[in-house]
């Protein structure tokens, strides 16, 4: 397998039979519990992250194959944060979404899940 990194667009291309693209990720800033994010739902924060990523990379939402998001604490009102965030940010409803809840390392686990999905 050959890998090529385009630092300008921060995109990793893995070249094999088919081209597979792993797009740069993003996150919301850390804040103390019960402060500025107090009145926001989880999916709203996720929506900001997804929209920011789409804007930063210039990626058309119709080209997204999958959304994997990490969250520290799940919320009963937003059971699948990835799905609801994706829909709220304009990702088509045919796109598979998964939410990873694993305390402080959920983002790392989401990245690993994405890599595993690409490699399979």
Identify the meaning behind each predicted range:
Residues 101-120:
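Active-site-proximal alpha-helical scaffold in enzymes
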């Amino acid at each position: 397998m050959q890998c090529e990194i385009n630092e300008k667009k921060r995109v990793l291309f893995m070249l094999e039979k088919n081209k597979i693209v792993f797009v740069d990720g993003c996150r919301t800033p850390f804040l103390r519990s019960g402060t500025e994010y107090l009145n926001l739902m989880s999916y709203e924060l996720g929506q900001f992250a997804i929209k920011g990523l789409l804007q930063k990379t210039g990626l058309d939402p119709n080209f997204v194959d999958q959304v994997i998001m990490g969250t520290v604490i799940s919320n009963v009102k937003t059971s699948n944060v990835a799905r609801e965030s994706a829909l709220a940010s304009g990702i088509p409803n045919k796109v598979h979404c998964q939410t990873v809840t694993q305390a402080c390392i959920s983002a790392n686990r989401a990245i690993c899940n994405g890599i595993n999905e690409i490699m399979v």
